[in-house]
């Protein structure tokens, strides 16, 4: 257990560093390009290689590769398997690169048909010719990360993504004044090279860097089939991003950037709280008999964290966007639309967070069918309602958070209804979380009437969180009391040990 905890801690630390530098990367793009035709074009062109990066990073490749690799190690076929899978990845990535280089205009037209008559289209076509070259780099990153994880190397693979962001930021800052918008495309490639350097060094050091072998024998065919099947579930979330890009291309210039900037912020509490909770829950319910108790606790804890996060994003949307992005070429109009989107996206945070917990219940029972169906249902609903809101009701860019709210709540109901054993809904706790969050929102509103400085208001977030937590204790909410008891008890123990 200590080794598991240490490995999880190291991996989480690497991911946290990557998140921090990821936001610095976005802020740098916003500084130089704001929400413009150039930024829209870049986010469109980077969508394809970035989708593969996220699929690989979220475990789509690891989920298949690691069991096969582990079996090959046991049978002393490690080198042969590594050579064949390396060859497969090279073939796959280079095939996609060739298609991207031969048909860039057609690909951009399919992804974002609404920009064909706009200046954005020519920029996107130019960018794609560069960004598609990132795919072999990210494929090698996924391959090397999977090998190193099996070898017990956790921190370096997780921190490699940070090096991508760091390389991207430095390249953009250094090259912008010389190359202009082309600095964005080159920053992706330089960041990709930064990303694979530490993994390559470790593979070479451990003598695990093999010469690729191009083979399509029975083992590789089985591996490929399982990978493509697994890819379906992991790619559904990325398909949702393509749907958003497709629909946003029909709106005013800058809309794709508005959606991107806002989504990056509202997804943060979901990834920090619910994903980490769901991973922990999966480990617990897979080994313990008292699964219902752990699931109930996870649901309460998810609500306890996601509801105030939702309130905070709603009340502080303008201030948060201002602190993160409002500088350089990020205009007042960009701030208006991005913060407006964020305030609406905030309502979806609890629904998406709870989805992760319920999906974990299915995974613990080895049921991948329902979570996969729910992911594609989510894409369908977002596409349906997004189209209705944009083309029939003319809601413009605000169509996306409204469609996300309907989709996320509907999918949550679907996941709950399909549970073989219903988990109890903690209505009593829910009411307390809503009351405490409302009073926290009142405190935010009060401080906003005293100062309009966004940096001061955002710096008060820990105070708002503490106020919410204390209010829960006043309401006698059991989880808050247990947490406070644990903190107080640990403090007493440490005090006795120091004496």
Curated annotation (Swiss-Prot):
It is a multi-pass membrane protein. It is found in: Cell inner membrane. Its main location: membrane. Keywords: Cell inner membrane, Cell membrane, Cell shape, Cell wall biogenesis/degradation, Membrane, Peptidoglycan synthesis, Transmembrane, Transmembrane helix, Transport. One of its GO terms (molecular function) is lipid-linked peptidoglycan transporter activity. Pfam families: MurJ. Pathway: Cell wall biogenesis; peptidoglycan biosynthesis. One of its GO terms (cellular component) is plasma membrane. One of its GO terms (biological process) is lipid-linked peptidoglycan transport. The chain crosses the membrane at residues 4-24, 26-46, 88-108, 130-150, 154-174, 184-204, 227-247, 265-285, 297-317, 335-355, 375-395, 396-416, 425-445, 455-475. Belongs to the MurJ/MviN family. Involved in peptidoglycan biosynthesis. Transports lipid-linked peptidoglycan precursors from the inner to the outer leaflet of the cytoplasmic membrane. This is Probable lipid II flippase MurJ. It comes from Aquifex aeolicus (strain VF5).
